[in-house]
Amino acid sequence: MGNGETLSIFPHLAGTFHYFFNHVYARRPFRYPEAVIDTCLGVFDRQDYPLGAQVGFAEIDWVFCLTRSLQQSGHRFGACRAALASFAARYVPFLSGLDASNQAFDDLHQLFGAMCCLAELQQAAPGLIRTEQPLKLVLDRRPFI
């Protein structure tokens, strides 16, 4: 790099998500869930990636890695809950504030990622996201994105 820029670990975390949802579907444990939690919290705290500012998959990548690692280890539970609450407080208003004509809604794949993120948040942190009916966690039924 040489120009003072630093590389983010986030792309690697996002790639890991694709392995993790298959591990969950196969009911297999993650390796090193505590390290994944530390990485997720670090990405969030350092703002390594603009989470909660787009309709897409980055958000589900981060939320899923954090929540499912937390289910397996309980490591830094309070910090995880605080990060999820902070993220939801930013992400839900962002999505709610988008105009229906926004191009983000034209891409069904990206919209699916956003909906998966909301469903994961709703399950992992009850009360953060309220809907008339619970959102369905598609990744628990079919591990494919």
Model-inferred region functions:
Residues 3-11, 26, 35:
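Active-site loop segments of alpha/beta catalytic cores
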Residues 11-17:
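Generic helix N-cap/helix-start motif at coil->alpha-helix transitions
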Residues 5-9, 40-50:
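Solenoid-like repeat scaffolds
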Residues 16, 22-44, 54-145:
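Terminal, non-catalytic domain-edge segments
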Residues 1-7, 54-57:
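Short intrinsically disordered, low-complexity coil segments enriched in acidic
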